[in-house]
């Protein structure tokens, strides 16, 4: 398992790297934003621990650049920026988790274990329900065989709902599995992405395929629900 630690404070970076190396990971380190982007675009990493306040290039810009061509590598933001707006921006830009400084190494290692476990869970290539089909490899969505353009988070929501057909999925579950975090303050972000997803699907299908069951959560509408 190969990790990259991007952190401009050398003492913190080296301490994290040593802890993860001792835990059995192969670890590279980088203290500069521009150098980090070069590493990321030329090497293959399973997970990146990414600071935001970096010399040379801001961590958020690095993340956005990465996600233009790579949705598979896990990214855990580790930053002193602790405002809700910072967390929302980071998660919406494609981070899988967001951890504030100061932090405990044990918690960081636990989050890394959780993220890397999820990466290697075997999934069906295509998930289907009625007129909806989601290709988990190509990350493409079809409704009545018409390709629909969805954002990264909308795809994540739809994928998780299709993986859990037949039961409502709570906002807390979506937060944990789509955003890889469990922060109550992001429930508004879920509603925004959910509303957009439902509108896009309804425009093609002619009906809203997602039910909101009050007090329970969201689920894909099935024949028994119509």
Question: Where are the predicted features?
Answer:
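N-terminal/domain-start alpha-helical segments
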Residues: 1-119
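Glycine-rich nucleotide-binding loop
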Residues: 35, 215-219
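Structural detector for helix-capping/boundary residues
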Residues: 43, 106, 130-132, 137, ...
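The C-terminal output helix
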Residues: 113-126, 166
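Short aromatic/basic micro-patch
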Residues: 126-128, 133, 168, 191
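A structural micro-motif at secondary-structure boundaries
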Residues: 128-155, 219-226
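Positively charged, aromatic-enriched patches within helix-turn-helix-type DNA-binding elements
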Residues: 140-209, 214
């Amino acid at each position: 398992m190969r990790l990259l630690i991007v952190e401009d404070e050398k003492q913190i970076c080296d301490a994290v790297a040593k802890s993860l190396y001792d835990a059995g990971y192969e670890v590279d380190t980088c203290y500069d934003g521009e150098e980090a982007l070069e590493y990321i675009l030329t090497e293959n990493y399973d997970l990146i621990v990414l600071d935001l306040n970096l010399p040379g290039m801001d961590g958020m810009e690095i993340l956005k650049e990465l996600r233009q061509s790579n949705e598979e590598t896990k990214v855990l933001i580790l930053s002193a920026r602790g405002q809700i707006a910072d967390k929302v921006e980071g998660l919406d830009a494609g981070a899988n988790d967001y951890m504030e400084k100061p932090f405990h190494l044990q918690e960081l290692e636990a989050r890394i274990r959780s993220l890397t476990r999820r990466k290697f869970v075997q999934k069906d290539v295509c998930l289907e329900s009625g007129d909806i089909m989601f290709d988990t490899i190509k990350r493409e969505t079809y409704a009545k065989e018409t390709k629909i353009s969805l954002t990264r988070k909308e795809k994540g929501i739809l994928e998780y709902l299709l993986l859990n057909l037949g039961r409502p999925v709570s906002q807390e579950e979506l937060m944990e599995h789509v955003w890889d975090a469990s922060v109550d303050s992001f429930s508004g972000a879920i509603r925004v992405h959910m509303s957009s997803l439902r509108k896009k699907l309804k425009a093609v299908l002619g009906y809203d395929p997602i039910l909101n069951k009050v007090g329970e959560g969201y689920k894909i509408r099935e024949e028994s629900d119509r």
